[in-house]
Amino acid sequence: VTVRGRRVELDAVFVLHHRPWRDTSRMLDVFTREHGRLMLFARGVRGPRSRSASLLQPFVPLLASWTGSGETAQLTQVEAAPGGSVVGLPAGALLSGWYLNELLLKLVLRADPQPAVFDLYARTLDRLRDGQAVAAVLRGFERDLLVQLGFGLELGREAQGGAPLQADRYYHFHPSLGFVATSDDAEAAYAGRSLLALAEDDLQEDAVLEDARRLMRTALDDALEGRELRTRSVAR
């Protein structure tokens, strides 16, 4: 990536959302590796002679250049990232991809560089392209996103005293506190073995996946602070 005054050259970029702007242009909500989320104006890309329209689609890894900053930045160049897919996601993974995008749009602040989150997103798209189990892929993304954005999801220890979680015990989760041991018949308790499996990305068993789904929903609800996710139904 090169930064020259108010010009940025060839940063890694994904388009999260786009909408028409005037007759032949688009407004792009993009996630860049080194500059975070930005709004870019892409002039003329909807015109009949545009060569970049097919590239400026969600889920396609790109290299982009732009001038300006804030709400006035303008796209000046775009090309496919070396070695990246130029066809987005397969049809069966599209809804999951939109769910990832909505999480980023809701939780990642504008102009806040998050290179680790960018890399996590890119890896997750690759896993979806490879046809890996969708539920396990989404739970892993949710877990790592919350950790990277500082929401304090500590899967390995109890909130009070920091004792390691035990596989044969059960726990309640309090978003502002963490995990608290409880009895095995407590309502909405999480199995310790499920929490440890989630921490190790071992998401093959149905019981583990169900506990992981419930936990991630609770943790994300807290992070979203009441904002709704339109795509949440695909994350079950």
Sequence positions of predicted segments:
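Non-catalytic alpha-helical scaffolds and adjoining flexible linkers that form interface surfaces
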Residues: V1-R236
